[in-house]
C-alpha cells in the first residue's frame, strides 16, 4: 500500500495526514500523540475513526498540524484521518458518516463589527 494523504480543517486549524501501513504509531509535528495532546479526551477524539473501524493497529499516521487551539486541532485531525481511511477503503464511508466523522464543521468565529465592542455585543445604552 502506498502512502495516502488527506486534509482536515476546523476553525483555524489545518491537519495534513499521511497514512501508511504500520503498527498504529501516530506522529504529530515530529512528536508522539500523547506528547502533543496530553489530554486523554483529545487523544480519544483523534482515535475515534480508527476505533470505529477497528484499524488502530493497522496504520502509521504522520501529521502536519498548524493553526487554531487544541480542540480545533484534534477535530481537524479526526476529519483528516476519516477522509484518509475512506480513500483507502471506500466501503467504510457509511460507517464513518453515521458517526459524523466525515462532516466538516463549518462553524467559525464571527467577525467583529464596526461601532460595537464585539461581534454581537453592543455598547452600553443609556436612556438618560
Swiss-Prot record:
Disordered: region residues: 97-128
SUPFAM superfamilies, per the entry: Ribosomal protein S5 domain 2-like
Keyword match Transport: no
Gene Ontology MF terms in the entry: RNA binding; structural constituent of ribosome
Comp. bias intervals (Basic residues): 114-128
Sorted UniProt keywords: Ribonucleoprotein, Ribosomal protein
Keyword Glycoprotein in annotation: no
Chain intervals with Basic and acidic residues compositional bias: 97-113
GO biological process: translation
Record-level GO cellular component terms: cytosolic small ribosomal subunit
HAMAP family: Ribosomal_uS9_B
Entries under PANTHER family matching the protein: RIBOSOMAL PROTEIN S9, SMALL RIBOSOMAL SUBUNIT PROTEIN US9M
Family, as annotated: Belongs to the universal ribosomal protein uS9 family.
Record protein name field: Small ribosomal subunit protein uS9
Organism: Phocaeicola vulgatus (strain ATCC 8482 / DSM 1447 / JCM 5826 / CCUG 4940 / NBRC 14291 / NCTC 11154)
Gene behind this protein: rpsI
Amino acid at each position: 500500500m502506498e502512502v495516502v494523504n488527506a486534509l482536515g480543517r476546523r476553525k483555524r486549524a489545518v491537519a495534513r495526514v499521511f497514512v501508511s501501513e504500520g503498527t498504529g504509531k501516530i506522529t504529530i509535528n515530529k512528536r508522539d500523540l500523547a506528547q502533543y495532546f496530553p489530554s486523554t479526551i483529545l487523544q480519544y477524539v483523534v482515535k475515534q475513526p480508527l476505533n470505529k473501524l477497528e484499524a488502530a493497529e493497522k496504520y502509521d499516521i504522520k501529521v502536519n498540524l498548524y493553526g487554531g487551539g487544541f480542540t480545533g486541532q484534534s477535530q481537524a485531525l479526526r476529519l483528516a484521518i476519516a477522509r484518509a481511511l475512506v480513500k483507502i477503503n471506500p466501503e467504510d464511508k457509511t460507517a464513518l458518516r453515521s458517526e459524523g466523522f466525515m462532516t466538516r464543521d463549518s462553524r467559525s468565529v464571527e467577525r467583529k463589527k464596526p461601532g460595537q465592542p464585539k461581534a454581537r455585543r453592543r455598547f452600553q445604552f443609556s436612556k438618560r
